């Protein structure tokens, strides 16, 4: 990513009433959807400037540099805005191959079955106890 000369581009994003926009992180090489998170204006600006995904943690009420604890950073290759300008898509390279705090490649590891249950379909790549020491 490169350092934008101005921040006018941020004005084109349709922020919600809390100043947030939903963000989808998609692995560029495979097309896999890895996670969903939120960004505020500062997070999106810093993501564009640094080339690494920085989100807004609603639970911690602070910026969250993805991988700051685990080392599983997301290198941002492309930032896209949807047709309504209210969802951001990050095309990323997932360092370490793990995006989910459960130790899986993707946060979307549960599949709905016709009987109304959920099935875990993706394995744990690394035990979270070994990631977050």
UniProtKB/Swiss-Prot annotation:
It comes from the Bacteria. It catalyses: 1-(5-phospho-beta-D-ribosyl)-5'-AMP + H2O = 1-(5-phospho-beta-D-ribosyl)-5-[(5-phospho-beta-D-ribosylamino)methylideneamino]imidazole-4-carboxamide. It is found in: Cytoplasm. Keywords: Amino-acid biosynthesis, Cytoplasm, Histidine biosynthesis, Hydrolase, Magnesium, Metal-binding, Zinc. Pfam families: PRA-CH. Zn(2+) binds at residues 83, 100, 107. Catalyzes the hydrolysis of the adenine ring of phosphoribosyl-AMP. Belongs to the PRA-CH family. This is Phosphoribosyl-AMP cyclohydrolase. The gene is hisI.
């Amino acid at each position: 990513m490169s350092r934008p000369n101005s921040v006018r581009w941020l004005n084109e994003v349709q922020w919600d009433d809390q100043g947030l926009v939903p963000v989808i992180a998609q692995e560029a090489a495979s097309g896999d959807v890895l996670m969903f998170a939120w960004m505020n204006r500062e997070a999106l600006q810093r993501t564009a400037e640094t080339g690494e995904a920085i989100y807004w943690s609603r639970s911690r009420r602070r910026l969250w540099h993805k991988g700051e604890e685990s080392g599983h950073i997301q290198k941002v290759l492309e930032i896209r805005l949807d047709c309504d300008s209210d969802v951001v898509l990050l095309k990323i390279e997932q360092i370490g191959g793990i995006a989910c705090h459960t130790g899986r490649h993707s946060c979307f590891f549960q599949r709905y079955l016709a009987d109304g249950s959920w099935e875990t379909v993706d394995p744990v790549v690394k035990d979270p106890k070994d990631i977050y020491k």
